[in-house]
Amino acid sequence: MFGLEFFLVLEALLFLFTCYQVVKAGRILDEIQDKLSEVKRGERVGTKRKYGTQNKYTGLSKGLEPEEKLRLGRNTWREIRRKRGKREKKKDQLAEVSRKRSLCSSLDGLGEPALSSSEADEEFSSEETDWEEEAAHYEKKGYQPGKVLANQLRKPKAAGEGQFADWPQGSRLQGPPYAESPPCVVRQPCAERQCAKRQCADSFIPREEQRKIQQAFPVFEGAEGGRVHAPVEYLQIKELAESVRKYGTNANFTLVQLDRLAGMALTPADWQTVVKAALPMMGKYMEWRALWHETAQAQARANAAALTPEQRDWTFDLLTGQGAYSADQTNYHWGAYAQISSTAIRRWKGLSRAGETTGQLTKVVQGPQESFSDFVARMTEAAERIFGESEQAAPLIEQLIYEQATKECRAAIAPRKNKGLQDWLRVCRELGGPLTNAGLAAAILQSQNRSMSRNDQRTCFNCGKPGHFKKDCRAPDKQGGTLTLCSKCGKGYHRADQCRSVRDIKGRVLPPPDSQSAYVPKNGSSGPRSQGLKDMGTGLSGPRKQSERRPRKTHKVDLRAASDFLLMPQMSIQPVPVEPIPSLPLGTMGLILGRGSASTLQGLVVHPELWIVNIPQKYQVLCSSPKGVFSISKGDRIPQLLLLLPDNTREKSAGPEIKKMGSSGNDSAYLVVSLNDRPKLRLKINGKEFEGILDTGADKSIISTHWWPKAWPTTESSHSLQGLGYQSCPTISSVALTWESSEGQQGKFIPYVLPLPVNLWGRDIMQHLGLILSNENAPSGGYSAKAKNIMAKMGYKEGKGLGHQEQGRIEPISPNGNQDRQGLGFP
């Protein structure tokens, strides 16, 4: 019995001893792993550099090894093979210890107290040294260029230099959103960033995760404490551009992608690049940039009144990357990047869309079949573009939503109007759309209208059968039997009295249908109309009848173009030949006027003039087309001749006789001017003296620009000025001017202001002066014998003026009516 107990105790002691050894080995392994961690190894490397201690493996190249080490036999092939075998042996020992630790992990609580760190250091000092050598050799061999590492080892960094000197070489740090900026900013070129990427390869973070971390902030802090700028990746810009193209700028998916970009520390230049690449048109980018600058200006004014001194330095140039901040945008405070992203996204949401009524919230109305939630979304989106994401505008938006909603939604909201917008959405979620009473009623009425339209089928007026109209009927025509080719146009199978063609098969213009035709539709002819100029009461073209050659009761005669003519704006006024009218006697007077339809509707301008029928010749009419090209065909009726009929029944004027230019009498005062000299006249206009030449051919007076005071206002006239030259838009006085002659005569006129060498006084001044032209007292005897004979028949008496009773009247001369149609007129 005693032997059995002794055996059990001995077995238990052996078991405890074995567990003790296993636990001891496990704790030693933990200490080794802790000492070989990245941070501890960096601290030891920094300590060695601080005290000038150099690693014995400074490089494998011959140029970096001292000659003394080569003479002592270090780093020879035998030494390298020995150390390599030692490293493999150490790996096997660590693997065996790890296997034993996994077997006894459940008995961790049965072990003795852990060994002190000093004992562990003494026991594994040699192993630790070998591990450091192995790690340094591993880093130097595969993850860092030899030249860069040699420079770093030859120039150790002083202790405490830089804010991040205690961190291991190559570690990438992400700055907090509102942390203080490092003292220095380093913009690394591409080659240095590749070197930094190699130095970060000894991190425990996988390379894919490191790439995602780099995307988080295009501006990030490097390993040496400086900031590095990395551009936004191509895939992110591509996804944003595709989202804008497929869904639009304000789609939810597009805005979510912008919110993801807002979490990054994007510089102003980055935002401009991203927006320019994402928006489809350059005009949209310019609109966004203008809105962004406006919002940045408002944000800069708010920053100037901030409490913190850092935020007061965030000016407009800083937020937009202009001025002194155009070259270096990575040294901003971390909070400034958040403001830049906020202003950029806010202005993105404010971009206008084609066809929308932006800025008019009262026009956002809920449709009859639109759900209440969609209507609220449209109203909220339109309000955000005007007010931004402001809570102060929430009451106004709610009031507009209530007023612009449908009648059913307002009835549901009214009992709980003070509950808020979220409660309105819950109550009205089933209202709106085609399933409401109003929607069902509209659908029922629409279906009834469709059924009624199906039953109300019209029948053919030719055959009387339903299903088609007369124009599509294939049955023979009841009125005329079998149809033949039209004798009028020659282009279709229909009767001539039903022809609606404007031109025949040869291109000639057809006359309008006769109003006395046997077949006239009930609603009038609905076919095409004549393409020529319209005539008020008469057709423009058509067969000329003999009755049109004679004066009608209205005393108007239509004149036809004698040939084809083309008028253009740059041609100014051109004479257009017209056909003479042989039925009018010679000496007939008339006034040429344009037709209303031709002048007003078609753009042709016929300039009025007095026309006297002389000997048979080729007559012409002055026409122009200032608004476009106008084509005149031969035979078109363009001008009208308004005949001036004789007036033999005119009574004598009972009032005082008014003598004006053109009248003469015994008591008339004459101004005799010799034609050897230029007839000059000096006038005082608005207190200033002007000297000019009398021009009987000018309707309006003209003042030279050399005489015109600069203080007097002028404007451009809408009428053209035609004389020896042509002026399309002449300058004219803006106000009426008062003139006064040396004899006290006064009047008002509105002169033209043109660059002429002299001033010209026209008939607007000479009429008020009472000037006349006369050759009665000419040295050659005055009028010719033929003229005196004609004047004698009209009642002229030499030396007593022109007129029957020497009355000097101003009305037109009334010739004696002759039955043989001779003289100036006829009764």
Swiss-Prot record:
Which keywords belong to this entry? Aspartyl protease, Hydrolase, Metal-binding, Protease, Repeat, Signal, Transposable element, Zinc, Zinc-finger
Which residues does this entry assign to the site Cleavage? 22-23, 217-218, 261-262, 441-442
**Gene3D superfamilies (alphabetical):** 1.10.1200.30, 2.70.40.10, Acid Proteases (2.40.70.10), Human Immunodeficiency Virus Type 1 Capsid Protein (1.10.375.10), Zinc finger, CCHC-type (4.10.60.10)
Q: Where is the composition biased (Polar residues)?
A: 515-529
State the Pfam families in the record: dUTPase, G-patch, Gag_p24, Gag_p24_C, RVP, zf-CCHC, zf-CCHC_5
Q: Where are the zinc fingers (CCHC-type)?
A: 458-475, 484-501
Tell me the SMART domains matching this sequence.
G_patch, ZnF_C2HC
User: Does the record bear Metal-binding in its keywords?
Assistant: yes
Top EC group: hydrolase
What is the designated name of this protein? Answer: Intracisternal A-particle Gag-related polyprotein
Give the molecular function GO annotations: aspartic-type endopeptidase activity; nucleic acid binding; zinc ion binding
Region named Disordered = 108-143, 504-556, 800-827
UniProt key word Zinc: yes
Write out the GO biological process terms: proteolysis; viral process
- Basic and acidic residues: which segments have biased composition? 800-809
What start and end residues bound the annotated signal peptide?
Answer: 1-25
- Point to the regions of Acidic residues compositional bias: 119-133
Q: Where is the Peptidase A2 domain?
A: 690-765
Supply the InterPro entries for this chain. Aspartic_peptidase_AS, dUTPase-like, dUTPase-like_sf, G_patch_dom, Gag_p24_C, Peptidase_A2_cat, Peptidase_aspartic_dom_sf, Primate_lentivir_Gag_pol-like
PANTHER family given for it? Answer: ENDOGENOUS RETROVIRUS GROUP K MEMBER 24 GAG POLYPROTEIN-RELATED, IGE-BINDING PROTEIN
Q: Per the database record, which ranges form the G-patch domain?
A: 783-827
Q: Look up the EC number in the record and give it.
A: 3.4.23.-
**Active-site residues annotated for this sequence:** 695 (protease)
Where does this protein come from, organism-wise? Answer: Mouse intracisternal a-particle MIA14
